[in-house]
């Protein structure tokens, strides 16, 4: 154990602080002027999980779903002795009480599943708390740089900590499923996210990690190129001050990987590039839903789609003026469902070259796009169940449609597809008899252009 000794004349009210790697290990205030030697035991040269507050605060750790704190978990206040950490016990720190440090040797971190876990809470919402240190010092504080994190989870550890202003370091490159699930959910004072260097992800690893972090303005870099199911799902959901999105370099996606990732981020002005050409089920579902400051969409290069891949991707993006090209010729069920629903400033629709359709493929695709004046040509000869259902519903300025189907017998394929569009305009249809209609007439719903 290393010792630090300081000899000198200390003035009344003087404070001596010992910091290691910018982390305060211990501090001492002198009540009166004195000349003496003060010594500190530097057993804590490790970057323990450290909490700092300017005024008195309390920290309590609770457990859920039969979870039991690992016996190795300990805490120390103001550089004092290490004491075993117990659940439901309030620990006072901050201000004159000094910092609070945690350490442990728990291979599982603070959880064994997404529900069986420990959770930190602070007693005074009006006293802000800064957290620093390396989260791996809870896994093995003596060997934190080399310890395996293959089983370490910190699910919901800071859930609802509205007074938390900064996060600990999360340098692990080996992740396990649900490892950071909802870790900072509803941490409304968190302004900076930790670095996330992992390049290979695990199922649900970052799911809802920063959800409702309403003070977060910049997202961390996300260098991963190997994704996993739901890895980024809801990651920045409702981060209402987020202005900048990270680059997303992966070219092969996983089911639900970006689902709801930036849902209702109204200050996000630019979407990241999306280079992936191999898609997965619901991969981009609602990714930018409600991003009302988004004016341009990223390029979407995939030519073969997956089920629900673009479902509601830009729904409610009211300032989006131009849609990306959609070159895919091989569709999937619900692939474009509600993709631009409610995009009230969208003036031009992309070409839709596919001739073989799938159920619900264009379901409500342009629903409520009130600035749209012309529809893309719809070349498919045979329609399928619910394929064009409410596709242009409520597009009040739409006055030009070309739909070349010759078989419209599928269930619901044209239900309300042009309901609410302009009462007159240009409609172009196939020259041959349209199967499934009466006398070759195209059903319109309650209103619409067709006659043709």
Predicted regions and their residues:
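Solvent-exposed loop and capping/linker segments of extracellular ligand-binding repeat ectodomains
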Residues: 1, 17-19, 25-452
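Short, intrinsically disordered N-terminal pre-domain segments
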Residues: 1-15
